[in-house]
């Protein structure tokens, strides 16, 4: 009988110890929540809402954190399911867009098939700004815009895209493609 009492006592102590450890893990999980995942390439230095919040030279606001990652890598991080041709290297941050030069949509993709030929632009102002404005005011929702300048002229053609999964490919020429950045 003493043998069984001793065995039950050891079992009871083990159960109490297990429950105590479980409670400690549960409590620590409540007071120390999981941190946001780190941005690839460089660790976040501080939180931000716009690029002006990032005072370090060459840093931009991506995913709510200041980082020095390249524009192409930032676009891949920021835009869900984006596919970018590895030959595309010319990308610039603008306050509201990732702006790619020598780039067009893959017209075989669902993104490319959503292309709307908005027409020729003969603006005395920046034709890219005009195309961007058309995209911003497009009633069905515009995901990206593309401006293709005719060789040797100040005239060009504006295209709008409505599919939310961009597929970009390299195109040698005076083509500019812009995709909105996530603004917090």
UniProtKB/Swiss-Prot annotation:
Residues 28-184 are virion surface. It is a single-pass membrane protein. The keyword Membrane applies. GO terms for cellular component: host cell plasma membrane; membrane; virion membrane. Coiled coil: none annotated. It is found in: Virion membrane; Host cell membrane. It comes from the Viruses. Residues 1-6 are intravirion. The chain crosses the membrane at residues 7-27. Induction: Early structural protein. Its main location: virion. Signal peptide: none annotated. Keywords: Early protein, Host cell membrane, Host membrane, Membrane, Transmembrane, Transmembrane helix, Virion. Belongs to the asfivirus envelope protein p22 family. This is Envelope protein 169.
């Amino acid at each position: 009988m003493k043998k069984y009492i001793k065995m039950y006592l050891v079992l009871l102590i083990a159960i109490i110890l297990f429950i105590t450890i479980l409670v400690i893990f549960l409590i620590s999980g409540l007071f120390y929540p999981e941190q946001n995942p780190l941005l690839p390439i460089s660790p976040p230095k501080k939180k931000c809402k716009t690029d002006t919040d990032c005072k370090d030279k060459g840093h931009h606001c991506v995913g709510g954190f200041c980082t020095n990652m390249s524009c192409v890598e930032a676009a891949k991080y920021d835009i869900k399911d984006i596919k970018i041709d590895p030959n595309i290297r010319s990308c610039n941050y603008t306050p509201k867009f990732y702006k790619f030069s020598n780039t067009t949509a893959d017209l075989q993709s669902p993104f490319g098939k959503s292309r709307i030929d908005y027409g020729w632009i003969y603006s005395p102002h920046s034709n890219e700004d005009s195309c961007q404005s058309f995209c911003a005011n497009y009633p069905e929702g515009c995901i990206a815009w593309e401006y293709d300048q005719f060789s040797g002229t100040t005239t060009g053609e504006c295209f709008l895209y409505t599919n939310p999964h961009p597929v970009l490919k390299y195109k040698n020429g005076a083509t500019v493609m812009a995709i909105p950045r996530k603004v917090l």
